[in-house]
């Protein structure tokens, strides 16, 4: 098993175990004020960069969260979410044909958000910071040696993205006590291509991800 893959799986397992432990303890001591949520949904990932042409694509989300009373009409939401983020890049094949090459990024997010409750158990606005831990991006099979349009880079050259990204996020949650829908937007303020500039200093690569999420939350 590759070393990076092993450590990614080990980190994922550790994060899950930590969150489940915290949620279980909190649920035991504060049954009247805290609720565990199971989250599933979809995302649209956009890679914002001036270096070359990209297109957004859809991926999936799954995770756990805990919503608890914080102060008056404020709640606090702790969450961990696992995702697959997808996007495509304009390239030229070895036969000089233009092709869109797809990329997949496995990731895990840890977030801590304040929630302003507009209607108790039905409507709230969330905002706060989150950290995303990225695996190595996977380029579409057979397209690794395509040349990214407008550059001298190959498709495989931009796989080693930053392992950590910081996102401010804002969202809206609506529904019933035990079933809600959440829509949120996250914008990465760190350069996702920061790692690549040491290998390709003349390209001055810079990219900021934006993620639109649509999730269903089932509260236990």
Residue ranges and their predicted role:
Residues 27-65:
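Short glycine/proline- and aromatic-enriched beta-strand/turn motifs that initiate or cap beta-hairpins
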Residues 32-34, 56-60, 104-108, 162-168, ...:
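Residues that define the transmembrane beta-barrel architecture of outer-membrane proteins
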Residues 54-98, 218:
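Glycine- and aromatic-enriched membrane insertion/assembly motifs of diderm outer-membrane
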Residues 79, 88-89, 165-220:
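Predominantly the C-terminal beta-signal and adjacent terminal strand-loop region
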Residues 38-42, 62-68, 80-82, 110-116, ...:
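Residues on the lipid-exposed face of transmembrane beta-strands in outer-membrane beta-barrel proteins
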Residues 31, 69-73, 119-123, 177-179:
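Outer-membrane beta-barrel channels and translocator barrels
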Residues 1-39, 212, 216-220:
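Bacterial Sec-dependent N-terminal signal peptides
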Residues 47-54, 84-106, 135-161, 192-206:
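Flexible, solvent-exposed loop segments that connect beta-strands
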């Amino acid at each position: 098993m590759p070393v990076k893959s092993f450590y990614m799986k080990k980190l994922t397992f550790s994060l899950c175990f930590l969150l489940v432990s915290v949620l279980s303890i909190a649920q035991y001591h504060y049954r009247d004020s805290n609720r565990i949520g199971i989250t599933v949904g979809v995302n649209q990932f956009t890679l914002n960069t001036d270096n070359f042409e990209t297109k957004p694509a859809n991926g999936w989300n799954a995770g756990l969260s805990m919503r608890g009373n914080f102060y008056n009409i404020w709640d606090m939401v702790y969450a961990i979410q696992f995702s697959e983020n997808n996007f495509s890049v304009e390239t030229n094949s070895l036969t000089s044909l233009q092709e869109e090459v797809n990329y997949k990024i496995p990731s895990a997010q840890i977030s801590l958000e304040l929630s302003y409750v507009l209607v108790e158990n039905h409507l709230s606005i969330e905002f706060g910071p989150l950290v995303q831990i990225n695996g190595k991006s996977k380029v579409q099979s057979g397209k690794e040696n395509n040349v990214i349009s407008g550059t001298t880079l190959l498709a495989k050259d931009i796989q080693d993205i930053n392992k950590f990204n910081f996102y401010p996020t804002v969202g809206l949650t609506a529904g019933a006590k035990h079933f809600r829908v959440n829509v949120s937007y996250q914008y990465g303020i760190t350069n996702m291509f920061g790692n690549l500039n040491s290998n390709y200093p003349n390209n001055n690569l810079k990219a900021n991800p934006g993620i639109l999420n649509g999730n269903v939350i089932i509260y236990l």
